[in-house]
Amino acid sequence: VLLSWVLKHKGWPGDVTRAFNTTKMLDRICAKYGRKIHEHGIGFKYVVDYMLTQEILMGGEESGGIGFQRHLPERDGMLNALLLANVMAEEGKTLGQLVADLQTEYGEHQYGRIDLHIGDEIKNRAIARARVLEIGDKVFAGMPIVRVDMLDGVKFYLDNPEAEGRQNAAETWLLLRASGTEPLMRIYSESCSKESVARLLQAARAFALGG
């Protein structure tokens, strides 16, 4: 909501950054306004690195950490809350209505995450299995794997048959990321429907546990 509003009404300069596990809708918003978007590892420290070396309008991560370079190279929840309140006042809409407008313009994007508290042995074995899945002749949750990205964890881009015939259908992806400090694996997914996301998260849970 903030990115779309700033680009549409403020025209502030700079690129945009986003973490590896955040929505691809941001890419579509940037494409509309001719802005470059940088995808980086998970953690706000990567946003800071960009802000200290390049002209960055804003950057963010999945946990809600959003920063504006013209303000300071750090997250500021108070600023973001004030900006959102201003957007709602100017547009005369609730936050839910603003999100619905984005879904209409850029396609429905549904997102989910689960945390698995599992031991290091199971966690590491699951990541190792994910890394060797082949592209083309492998499927996940009934969806062909079309691309794999290992920037931070293992991320599968999938050919979701549910997206066929849908205008601006969200790209379907699934990310498995093992914590380096805890016996924990986080699993993220985004797709064009809540049902697809739920199915992928359930399949990923079974995969991580050895199913």
Range-by-range predicted roles:
Residues V1-G11:
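Cysteine protease catalytic core and zymogen-processing segment of caspase-like enzymes
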Residues W12-G211:
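Phosphate-binding and adjacent anionic-ligand microenvironments
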